[in-house]
């Protein structure tokens, strides 16, 4: 009875609930880069995502995964796309973001950042990265 009452109040007060999923510095060893040795040796890449999506009542009121997106499914999609070699981080970030928006219909927008650890750029730098925003 109480859950029914809460659901009625929630439905009256909100038409749509949005949420942001944060995945910070997902670490993956991958083979991306302009130089041939980068595609042979590989490097550590760190993917950070801020994903805005619509959350349904099942997740908020019923504690049911069916009302949102599984973090594990997001990570799996990122891993799949990161396994395909690219020369440019810009191209890679676009591909990963596009895959997520394509795979998960509840995603409204996302911000993606991909950092490459110790890139071969002639200077001592911890990482170089690219950020990109995408809207459905």
Model feature map: region roles:
Residues 9-136:
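N-terminal, polar/charged subdomain of small-to-medium soluble alpha/beta proteins
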């Amino acid at each position: 009875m109480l859950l029914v009452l809460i659901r009625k109040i929630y439905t009256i007060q909100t038409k749509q609930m949005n949420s942001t999923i944060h995945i910070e510095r997902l670490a993956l060893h991958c083979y991306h880069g302009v130089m041939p040795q980068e595609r042979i040796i590989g490097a550590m890449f760190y993917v950070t995502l801020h994903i805005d999506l619509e959350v349904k009542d099942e997740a908020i009121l019923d504690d049911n995964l069916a009302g949102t997106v599984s973090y594990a499914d997001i990570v799996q999609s990122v891993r799949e796309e990161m396994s395909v070699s690219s020369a440019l981080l810009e191209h890679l970030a676009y591909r990963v973001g596009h895959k997520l928006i394509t795979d998960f219909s509840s995603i409204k927008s996302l911000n993606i950042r991909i950092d490459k650890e110790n890139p071969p750029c002639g200077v001592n730098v911890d990482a170089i990265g690219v950020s990109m925003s995408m809207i459905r």
